[in-house]
């Protein structure tokens, strides 16, 4: 048994995730593809098996500790990069529908290869800008859960994610340990975009002193049609 598998199984047990053998094999295939493609395109700086198991795979699953996502729920991962958190969640929860969105076509090509090689179904990867994606009728307020892992500051991320979140759905931002000031700065944006801060869950990744914060925002009213604004504007002029 290799380092990735040993660490993954131990950490999953610690976090009370019951991984099957097929799911473990899927994570191994995912890791091998990640390392292979990372030689040619910049997917991740984290490549050691133990670190990938903890800081990518297990970290991606942490939101499942705080939310009971129902069968057939529609989940969107904005700014997914190399597929985190969306692909690990799909491996562990094959019963949900996952959409991965990223602004770089090379990364989307990688995601499609992973989907194909792992034989994943009811999952797709889309090449788009978050600002454009959220204005499209087929995506606007269509997702039960919108996830994003440390893509931008929360006040910017909210403008990317809340327009795609269904009324009474949830936007979950996966962040590092020191999040309080960032949440405070985002309070106006969250309100304007139709969200309400529900909770901030703090946790530690197993075996390493690495804290995480999961910011849970509920969609309580429709997002005004002017949001998200045109590409580049949310980052340059965040709602304040």
Curated annotation (Swiss-Prot):
Transmembrane segments: none annotated. Keywords: Cytoplasm, Methyltransferase, rRNA processing, S-adenosyl-L-methionine, Transferase. S-adenosyl-L-methionine binds at residues 79, 84, 130-131, 149. GO terms for cellular component: cytosol. It is found in: Cytoplasm. Its EC number is 2.1.1.-. It is an enzyme of class 2 (transferase). GO terms for molecular function: rRNA (guanine-N7-)-methyltransferase activity. Pfam families: GidB. SUPFAM superfamilies: S-adenosyl-L-methionine-dependent methyltransferases. It comes from the Bacteria. Belongs to the methyltransferase superfamily. RNA methyltransferase RsmG family. Specifically methylates the N7 position of a guanine in 16S rRNA. NCBIfam families: rsmG_gidB. HAMAP family: 16SrRNA_methyltr_G. This is Ribosomal RNA small subunit methyltransferase G. It comes from Desulforamulus reducens (strain ATCC BAA-1160 / DSM 100696 / MI-1).
